[in-house]
């Protein structure tokens, strides 16, 4: 039986620490704590309206994916990992991760409510799993690999790393290109916070696979899971580019295809198995965006000092800060 799943009936408290490396991962995650209200999107509204319609359509598809994906991650943490795992230090990490994923989910909802005032269009995005076949397909794939009745713990951790890494990564990179255009500062700030968090989540899954999982999946199974994730990302990116009529400034879908393969090979390395694609990085400027090397600058400077409500909606009241100097 896996060590992570063995109950220690004699242990009721977290101290004394028995798994210091896992505890350090938890403390690292704890240090990144933030809230969804800490980002100002007031400037983004004008940028969004000025954005060409095809480009807006591309980013709408990304938002539709994000609002669904984080809820599925939360579902897996609450119904599977947090019920099964018995090592307290690991359980602390996943408890903190679940809280972070709730912040991410709220942040994506704020983004949709801020940028898309039409309620019917908002609902189409919030109902992404029903309105977008590829998003539904991705959700089904995640649930398939997270099923504890069909997959070992090792297989599920590989799948979880693929979700937190592969399924999210291209979308993070696409949003980050808005920073190069000097637009959408709030969306970019959210993206930097969330991508950094997800990098730690993904890296921790790889750490557990390499250091705690006794029945590590065969390399061919790891490759199968990762390649399936890449194929889903390809399908989603093609769908999003079709919605944008192929016109998104800064990158092509072929560049995103290559990047996700480069990223996946690095994930293979972290899981101590052979690379699959052997391709270079088409976005060398995004090196810091890889896993837990996400840009950390200005995190504390972005903490709010003043607040303003950007969306006039009593049923969805949230406050956003004003300090122009933060950008």
Curated annotation (Swiss-Prot):
Catalytic center at which residues?
108
Which pairs of Cys residues are joined through disulfide bonds in the record? none
Which residues are Fe cation 1-binding? 70, 101, 104
EC numbers for this chain: 1.17.4.1
Listed under catalytic activity are: a 2'-deoxyribonucleoside 5'-diphosphate + [thioredoxin]-disulfide + H2O = a ribonucleoside 5'-diphosphate + [thioredoxin]-dithiol
- Pfam families found in the cross-reference section: Ribonuc_red_sm (PF00268)
Q: Which PROSITE patterns match?
A: RIBORED_SMALL
Cofactors demanded by this protein? Fe cation
Cofactor notes: Binds 2 iron ions per subunit.
- Binding of Fe cation 2, residues: 101, 164, 198, 201
BP GO annotations: deoxyribonucleotide biosynthetic process
User: What InterPro entries does the annotation carry?
Assistant: Ferritin-like_SF, RNR-like, RNR_small, RNR_small_AS, RNR_small_fam
Q: What induces it?
A: Expressed in the early phase of the viral replicative cycle.
Question: Could you name the domain of life of the organism this protein comes from?
Answer: Viruses
Q: Which Gene3D superfamilies match?
A: Ribonucleotide Reductase, subunit A
Q: Which SUPFAM superfamilies match?
A: Ferritin-like (SSF47240)
| UniProt keyword NAD present | no
One GO MF annotation is:
metal ion binding
The answer to whether keyword DNA repair applies is no
Provide this UniProt record's keywords sorted from A to Z. Answer: Deoxyribonucleotide synthesis, Early protein, Iron, Metal-binding, Oxidoreductase
Protein family according to the UniProt entry? Belongs to the ribonucleoside diphosphate reductase small chain family.
**Subunit annotation:** Heterotetramer composed of a homodimer of the large subunit (R1) and a homodimer of the small subunit (R2). Larger multisubunit protein complex are also active, composed of (R1)n(R2)n.
Role: Ribonucleoside-diphosphate reductase holoenzyme provides the precursors necessary for viral DNA synthesis. Allows virus growth in non-dividing cells. Catalyzes the biosynthesis of deoxyribonucleotides from the corresponding ribonucleotides.
Q: Which PANTHER family match?
A: RIBONUCLEOSIDE-DIPHOSPHATE REDUCTASE SMALL CHAIN (PTHR23409), RIBONUCLEOSIDE-DIPHOSPHATE REDUCTASE SUBUNIT M2 (PTHR23409:SF18)
Task: Tell me what this protein is called.
Answer: Ribonucleoside-diphosphate reductase small chain
Organism of derivation: African swine fever virus (isolate Warthog/Namibia/Wart80/1980)
The organism's lineage is: Viruses, Varidnaviria, Bamfordvirae, Nucleocytoviricota, Pokkesviricetes
């Amino acid at each position: 039986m896996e060590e992570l799943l063995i109950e220690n009936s004699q242990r009721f408290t977290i101290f004394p620490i028995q798994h210091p490396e896992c505890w350090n991962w938890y403390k690292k995650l704890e240090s990144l704590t933030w809230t969804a209200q800490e980002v100002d999107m007031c400037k983004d509204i004008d940028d969004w309206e000025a954005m060409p319609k095809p480009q807006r359509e591309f980013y709408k598809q990304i938002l539709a994916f994000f609002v669904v994906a984080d809820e599925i991650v939360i579902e897996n943490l609450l119904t599977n990992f947090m019920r099964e795992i018995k090592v307290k230090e690991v359980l602390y990490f996943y408890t903190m991760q679940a809280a972070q994923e709730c912040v991410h989910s709220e942040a994506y909802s704020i983004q949709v409510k801020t940028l898309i005032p039409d309620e019917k269009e908002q609902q189409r995005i919030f109902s992404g799993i029903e309105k977008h076949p590829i998003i539904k397909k991705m959700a089904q794939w995640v649930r398939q690999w997270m099923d504890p009745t069909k997959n070992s713990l090792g297989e599920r951790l590989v799948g979880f790393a693929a979700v937190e890494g592969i399924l999210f990564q291209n979308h993070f990179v696409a949003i980050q290109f808005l920073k190069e255009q000097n637009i959408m500062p709030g969306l970019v700030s959210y993206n930097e916070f969330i991508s950094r968090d997800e990098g730690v989540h993904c890296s921790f899954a790889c750490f557990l696979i390499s250091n705690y999982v006794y029945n590590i999946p065969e390399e061919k199974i790891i490759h199968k899971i990762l390649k399936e994730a890449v194929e889903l990302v390809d399908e989603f990116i093609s769908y999003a580019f079709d919605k944008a009529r192929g016109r998104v400034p800064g990158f092509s879908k072929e560049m995103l295809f290559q990047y996700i393969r480069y990223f996946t090979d690095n994930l293979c390395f972290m899981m101590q198995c052979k690379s699959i694609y052997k391709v270079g990085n088409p976005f060398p400027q995004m090196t810091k965006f890889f896993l837990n090397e996400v840009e950390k600058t200005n995190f504390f400077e972005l903490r709010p000092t003043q607040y303003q409500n950007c969306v006039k909606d009593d049923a969805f009241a949230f406050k956003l800060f004003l300090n122009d100097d933060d950008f």
